[in-house]
Amino acid sequence: MAYPFQLGLQDASSPIMEELMNFHDHTLMIVFLISSLVLYIITLMLTTKLTHTSTMDAQEVETIWTILPAVILILIALPSLRILYMMDEINNPALTVKTMGHQWYWSYEYTDYEDLCFDSYMIPTNDLKPGELRLLEVDNRVVLPMELPIRMLISSEDVLHSWAVPSLGLKTDAIPGRLNQATISSNRPGLFYGQCSEICGSNHSFMPIVLEMVPLKNFEDWSLSMI
């Protein structure tokens, strides 16, 4: 999860987030090299008199500055497209969970189980226990099995919402009348926090998401206790 004065991304806890972090580093390195080159050229222009201020035509230079940006864009686009296809791919999900956004809480339904559904509200600050996080804790956590592909079906009952869990590399819009889907897979057990990421009204900041990833045996025990 995030912490005060954090400069980087949250620790990756899913294969998709690991790919996104690698792509971020790849793109940042390209941006750094371009920025360094531009700064170097500007420095040369300001510190040396060996510049052609009256050049009217330079076919070689124009060819280079046309081809080079095209190559750079391709180097950025190819890994980006690969990750986009990975994020849309859903192969044999072990579990399907439907979540609906409301003003201002989330409701969840485990469609593979009968009558396994609940609402998830933020716990008010006055009701927090020692060690719990302000504006991030909920009364009902979403318990899911780790290391398994899980399909999330996401929609809304009223206005636009967005279901986002940064450490899992997930952000999907919840749109009234439309059913979006996403894949979740966690590499490790733990608690993963997120929030509504689409301004949805006066209590937009009070729609946290808490996923509890547990081993499959623990998930089966939990689901039996909830039915």
Swiss-Prot record:
Q: What is its main location?
A: mitochondrion
One GO MF term, please? copper ion binding
Task: Give the Mitochondrial matrix compartment stretches of this protein.
Answer: 46-59
Q: Indicate which residues the UniProt annotation says bind Cu cation A1.
A: 161, 196, 200, 207
- EC number, as in UniProt: 7.1.1.9
Sites binding Mg(2+) sit at 198
Q: Per the record, what are the reactions this protein catalyses? A: 4 Fe(II)-[cytochrome c] + O2 + 8 H(+)(in) = 4 Fe(III)-[cytochrome c] + 2 H2O + 4 H(+)(out)
Any GO CC annotation of this UniProt entry: mitochondrial inner membrane
Q: Which residues cross the membrane?
A: 15-45, 60-87
Entry superkingdom: Eukaryota
How is it placed in the membrane, per its record?
Multi-pass membrane protein
Keyword check for Ribosomal protein: no
Q: Which residues lie on this side of the membrane: Mitochondrial intermembrane?
A: 1-14, 88-227
Q: Which keywords accompany this UniProt record? A: Copper, Electron transport, Magnesium, Membrane, Metal-binding, Mitochondrion, Mitochondrion inner membrane, Respiratory chain, Translocase, Transmembrane, Transmembrane helix, Transport
* Cofactor needs: Cu cation
> Could you tell me which CDD domains the record lists for this protein?
CcO_II_C
Which Gene3D superfamilies does this chain map to? Answer: 1.10.287.90, Cupredoxins - blue copper proteins
GO biological process, alphabetically ordered: ATP synthesis coupled electron transport
Q: Which InterPro entries match?
A: CcO_II, CcO_II-like_C, CcO_II_C, Copper_CuA, Cupredoxin, Cyt_c_oxidase_su2, Cyt_c_oxidase_su2_TM_dom, Cyt_c_oxidase_su2_TM_sf
| Annotated compartments | Mitochondrion inner membrane
Subunit structure, briefly? Component of the cytochrome c oxidase (complex IV, CIV), a multisubunit enzyme composed of 14 subunits. The complex is composed of a catalytic core of 3 subunits MT-CO1, MT-CO2 and MT-CO3, encoded in the mitochondrial DNA, and 11 supernumerary subunits COX4I, COX5A, COX5B, COX6A, COX6B, COX6C, COX7A, COX7B, COX7C, COX8 and NDUFA4, which are encoded in the nuclear genome.
Described function: Component of the cytochrome c oxidase, the last enzyme in the mitochondrial electron transport chain which drives oxidative phosphorylation. The respiratory chain contains 3 multisubunit complexes succinate dehydrogenase (complex II, CII), ubiquinol-cytochrome c oxidoreductase (cytochrome b-c1 complex, complex III, CIII) and cytochrome c oxidase (complex IV, CIV), that cooperate to transfer electrons derived from NADH and succinate to molecular oxygen, creating an electrochemical gradient over the inner membrane that drives transmembrane transport and the ATP synthase.
Q: What is this protein called?
A: Cytochrome c oxidase subunit 2
* Protein species of origin: Microtus pennsylvanicus (Meadow vole)
